[in-house]
């Protein structure tokens, strides 16, 4: 990559004498940046990219790479600036246009993001990635028919990119004789030539297709292959993950809470929706976001980020949860204030703003102390249904515990033990449990409980949640565009014969 980059940019240098530097020195910097970037060392890569640009600000590829690294570090606003520089230098640069769109989408500037994807298609009509990104945005905004069309166009241009088939599968069911299913089955007949990631997407998609066709045995065989392939690609420290949950139960006692109460930021704006993935959190947020005084902010790691900011200020920078032992009342208040400032950047006018980062169940004790007036809603669903749905999903990031049945069961058990602990040590009524099955059985009754818990007056628009136009970036993006349906309840039963390791781990908490 570095040699190709320099071949292009040094032609420009011949016309711009001020930019001439020894090629070898620039090549060394570029290679160092690319190595860091490829290894996921984004902060180090950014520093080198900035060095390069200080010498050669005319390199559009380096601006693009800088933007990519900034976005990977959770700095989409800075990434937007970098991509804008890349396009200023090279207007017909489809990859940078797509990356620009992704960063804009992360900032919820969706109209602008869509425009960048369409601009990328205009300058490169055969760029499958642009159609795929456009499809994902259309799916997130509920324009499912348009999303299908975009994914189909992407597949026509890149028929061997099985991640696109996976995206298409999320917005349409498969049927017998489906031409896309035929293509997938042909690829699965001899997957040995495919990279592991392509095989993984292929098997996740075939699992969905066979589930659509009620071929449970075939579906689960593909699901096992997909998860096995994914599990081999990731690092998951189970002892550390479960140990943190155990440490929270040990550390945050009744006495711990009592000694620190009354010192947080007083605001009722935040509404935390916590729980396991695939437990109904998106449905709860969609109901809330249909209320005129609520803004649904979706999943953002805001609480984790501000907790990290406070941690760095404490003597010795102790990690969570032990950092809570070293926090003063002022620290809890500062954490709550920092979080509130970040949250309200999403909406300055809403009376309530939801935070649907499911992993915030780890922070419930911290939330209570730092934001004592914030609502906390816990989404609960049948354990086996929750876990099977997670096992059936390929997550774009995180959720490393979901790719092995036994690990998933152990994680779920520890999560439920921690939630029971929060109920025990916090004041009665502090956490509202909302069971998915209860929402399905009587959506109005459940919705009224949710709205009341958030201190809002009832609004009938909450019952038409499937009509609410907003962005949903989770795996449930297509489902929440439909009215309530019941076919996800007890879905695990048709896979009971295959999920023994999961059921064995769940047995101690069987309901």
List PLM regions with ranges.
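TPR/Sel1-like alpha-solenoid repeat signature
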Residues: 29-32, 36, 48, 62-76, ...
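PAPS-dependent sulfotransferases, especially Golgi type II membrane carbohydrate sulfotransferases
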Residues: 150, 165-169, 181-193, 202-270, ...
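Phosphate-binding active sites in nucleotide-utilizing proteins
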Residues: 263-369
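Conserved phosphate-donor/acceptor-positioning beta-strand/loop module used by diverse small-molecule
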Residues: 367-389
